[in-house]
A protein has these predicted regions:
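Accessory, non-ATPase domains that flank or precede helicase/AAA+ motor cores in DNA-metabolism machines
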Residues: 1-309, 828-834
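Short glycine-/polar-rich loops that comprise or flank the Walker A/P-loop
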Residues: 53, 58, 382, 429, ...
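Conserved helicase motor core of P-loop NTPases
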Residues: 465-604, 608-611, 811, 816, ...
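ASCE P-loop NTPase helicase motor core
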Residues: 336-339, 343-519, 710, 721
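C-terminal accessory regions
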Residues: 624-630, 636-834
Length: 834
């Protein structure tokens, strides 16, 4: 977009947020190079303290606000020399306590031209003003220094080409040291300022004249690519050769230059030798992931080694029989084995899919443990902790066990995903049970196990076939491979009525099979064939039919793999919002590309233990309060999460989004009465078995699948890529730390013919999705320089072959009715079949 400038006088500041310097102001226009025709314009952006009635020039892009019309989104600004009257008004404003109009006039009279610079240079002249006390004088100078310094720094940062948001993040991190630090060490931003990546830091460094082959540039790119690869792929390490390749691509594309790969390899060697990153043989680790994996091994080993008095098997068996009698159930052999092993082990792993009785076994473990130790489960001070990765999973645990449960973050006192700290003492418990452990990443697992005492018994529960954690690692899957850890896998399905087929479907898909009756209508599930272009028309009809049958709109959840596209989360959220909560007059708040309305269904995106709201929690907007009525002077959204009221001002709205449709990842740990699952070939590489399996197992009563049979077929046969982790080897002690920490040695070893990639990739079926899945062919025997001069071979794979009548083709889809011969009565019949 083109940048325009607007020069003029600030009429008034409409809104300001002191925490991030975001301001909205009204500018009376004197001059502009745009074709904007009005005499005043709204200007928004990050800026320091500005003065009403003073002249400024703002540069930025013209944007169209749905409510306020065309406005300028500022990227940088300059203040003209302030007038005497403007300074008097500024000094006498609420910014400065104890300064009235007469005192302000006297200050301007004493200091003359450019008074702000002169005041900061020589504040002693203020002593000439008799009615200005020493306290007010010092407060005035201190506040002026902050305001003026902030403006100067933010303005200077903007002049370097930094976005207002980036400038604000940098200033919040370094305050008055911001300019000195970034001018001397711009690449430090990559490591220390959240949200500032390599490209932003590199643009700044280029403006400061730092060469494209400067060592600090190469090091910053290596560190950035190392962590980026882990976050994107879920790996805890990356092979040296792959890291070098990724880094050189970034370095060369950022400045359109060619680099000598040997220079980058040298800097990687230096990083390893300086312990800025870690290596095991040819594997390169981000420091936090290396030590987190090592910590998991260390702490679990510590816990296992301490063997306090464990009840004998016959004593456990006797207590278990009493529990069976109390509950009126009989555990089968595998379930009994699981309960006995769990109570005899310091660390035990229980796995199983839906309907296999995990909750029944957990309740058996808890009640038998209580009987063995003489505990009254009705008391509040039990030495038992129940934990889960998400708030919804923790609440489900509480509902199923009737015991207190909380998120892992709450138990550890962590307030967000990025909050890393060590507890001063161990968790106060003798038994801890952690559910939904497949969602726990390497960092969180390390913090959890570090906080568990030697004498505590640990029971890990999860479904190994669900999606792995969003963060790096596959801790549950890796721990299941450790021979020394006792474990039981539940496979027999118990929770299924005669008419229930969802659990059976999930079990078949888990085994990589699309059952022969997949497209048949069942009492609890249905499938509708649809091209991606038809999904937006079909979903509202399905939801409407569900509501007409008596199902609450809150009980219907759309799950999708992707955010973009016609069948994506963003589009479906907009469609469903207009269907279920249409706009009434102007009662909505715009935020980025979203409109928030009263009664909207919303999803919380981060953990906040102070507010008792967590990542994945679903709530309702209860009220929208305009800024002119709030203490914060910002628009505020009032929300309820299961009765817990939360209020967010505008600067915190990035913590929430609409929840009519949500990602399958975000749905983990939750169950919904009705799940609508649109799956088409648009989702491409994301279509993997564990993704579909996770989505299907979220449905408690009804499951509606719609999309393309080819996409479902591909997904269930595609196991996806296995993550690169090193946790198993740490337990097996089958590795040696590289003594010679040199990349030259690493590359030489690889060049002898061994493969440089350890990631096990299973591309699923031999025929993959059309135009979606690509492979990169790298010859590991080439030397490093030649590797990067070779073109990447991208070959398009063939589509899944399915029976032609199962899917729409490019030739015929546009000629078919959007409902594809399906009547609304057909949909209604499914929901009315109770």
């Amino acid at each position: 977009m083109q940048d325009f400038y607007f020069s003029g006088t600030i009429e008034r500041v409409i809104f300001e947020n002191a925490s991030n310097f975001f301001r909205i102001l009204l500018l009376e226009i004197d001059e502009t190079d745009s074709d904007f025709e009005d005499y005043e314009i709204i200007v928004t952006g990050t800026m320091g303290d500005v003065m009403e009635g003073e002249d400024y020039t703002f540069w930025g892009q013209l944007t169209n606000h749905p409510k306020y019309g065309e406005q300028l989104q500022m990227t940088r600004y300059e203040r003209s020399k302030p007038s005497a009257s403007g300074l008097i008004k500024y000094f006498a404003s609420d910014n400065f306590k104890g300064i009235g109009k007469k005192t302000a006039e006297r200050i301007v009279e004493i200091y003359g031209e450019d008074p702000i610079d002169q005041i900061l240079e020589d504040p002693s002249k203020l002593e000439q003003i008799p009615n200005l006390s020493k306290v007010n004088r010092e407060a005035f100078v201190a506040k002026l220094k902050i305001n003026y310094g902030t403006e100067q720094i933010l303005s200077k940062l903007s002049s370097y080409g930094l976005t207002p948001k980036a400038a604000s993040q940098i200033f919040n991190q370094y305050k008055e040291e911001s300019l000195n630090l970034i001018e001397e060490h711009p690449y430090l931003l990559v490591e220390e300022v959240q949200g500032i990546g390599f490209k932003i830091a590199d643009q700044l460094a280029e403006r400061l004249g730092i060469a494209s082959d400067a060592p600090e540039r190469l090091r910053a790119a290596l560190i950035h690519c190392l962590l980026e690869a882990s976050m994107e792929e879920g790996d805890t390490y990356i092979e040296a050769k792959a890291l070098l390749e990724r880094t050189i691509i970034l370095l060369e594309s950022a400045r359109q230059i060619e680099l000598d790969p040997a220079l980058v390899a040298k800097e990687l060697t230096n990083l390893i030798q300086e312990d800025k990153v870690q290596n095991i043989e040819t594997k390169i680790f981000d420091n936090t992931l290396y030590f987190a994996e090592q910590g998991i091994y260390t702490h679990l080993t510590r816990i296992i080694k301490d063997q306090p008095d464990i009840s004998a098997e016959d004593k456990i068996q006797a207590s278990l029989e009493e529990v069976e009698e109390e509950l009126g159930i009989t555990y089968d052999k595998v379930q009994k084995d699981a309960i006995i092993k769990a109570l005899q082990s310091k660390v035990f792993i229980l796995t199983g899919g839906p309907g296999t009785g995990k909750t029944t076994v957990i309740n058996g473990i808890i009640k038998t443990y209580a009987d063995l130790h003489g505990l009254d489960l009705k008391k509040s001070d039990l030495p038992i902790i129940l934990a889960a990765p998400t708030g919804r999973a923790a609440r489900r645990m509480n509902e199923l066990t009737q015991l207190p449960s909380a998120t892992i973050h709450r138990h550890l006192g962590l307030n967000s995903e990025d909050d890393f700290k060590t507890l001063e003492d161990y968790l106060d418990c003798d038994l801890i049970i952690i559910d939904e452990f497949s969602m726990v990443d390497t960092w969180l697992a390390n913090q959890l196990f570090e906080s568990i005492s030697d004498s505590t018994q640990v029971i890990i529960v999860g479904d190994q076939d669900q999606l792995p954690s969003v963060g790096p690692g596959q801790v549950l899957a890796d721990l299941l491979q450790i021979d020394d850890l006792p474990k039981v896998s539940l496979t027999k399905i118990f929770r299924q009525s005669e008419d229930s087929t969802i659990v059976t479907l999930a079990s078949q898909m888990r085994q990589g099979q699309l059952p022969a009756d997949f497209t048949e209508k069942k009492a609890d599930r249905s499938y509708f064939e649809a091209n991606a272009n038809h999904i937006p028309q079909m979903v509202p009809k399905i939801v409407s039919a569900a509501i007409k049958s008596g199902i609450s709109a809150q009980d219907v959840q759309i799950l999708a793999p992707m955010y973009r596209g016609q069948a994506g989360i963003n589009n479906l959220n907009t469609i469903m919002q207009d269907l279920l909560n249409p706009q009434e007059k102007a009662n909505q708040f715009a935020f980025n590309d979203i409109f928030f309305r009263k009664n909207d269904k919303i999803l919380h995106l981060v953990n906040d233990t102070e507010l008792n709201v967590f990542n994945g929690d679903i709530g309702i907007i209860t009220d929208l309060i305009p800024g002119k009525y709030t203490e914060s002077k910002q628009d505020e959204i009032y929300m309820s999460f299961d009765g817990n009221e939360v209020i967010y001002p505008r600067n915190e709205w990035n913590k929430i989004t609409l929840a009519y449709a949500m990602s399958i990842h975000k749905s983990q740990g939750s169950e919904f009465p009705v799940v609508i699952l649109p799956i088409t070939r648009q989702s491409g590489r994301m279509l993997q078995r564990n993704l579909i399996y996770t989505a299907i197992t979220r449905a408690k009563s009804k499951l509606v699948m719609l999309g393309e049979i080819a996409a479902f077929d591909y997904a269930v046969r595609n196991e996806g890529a296995k993550r690169n982790t090193f946790l198993i080897q740490r337990f097996e002690q089958t590795y040696t730390q590289a003594v010679d920490k040199s990349v030259e040695k690493i590359v030489k070893n690889e060049a002898t013919g061994a493969s440089n990639q350890t990631k096990t990739k299973n591309n699923g079926p031999s025929e993959t999705l059309e135009n979606k899945d690509f492979s990169e062919n790298i010859n590991p025997s080439q030397d490093l320089v030649n590797t990067y001069s070779q073109p990447v071979d991208k070959s398009v794979n063939k589509p899944v072959q399915t029976e032609e009548n199962y899917r729409l083709t490019e030739e015929n889809w546009s000629t078919i009715d959007p409902m594809i011969g399906l009547s609304e009565d057909d949909i209604a019949a499914f929901f009315n079949n109770n």
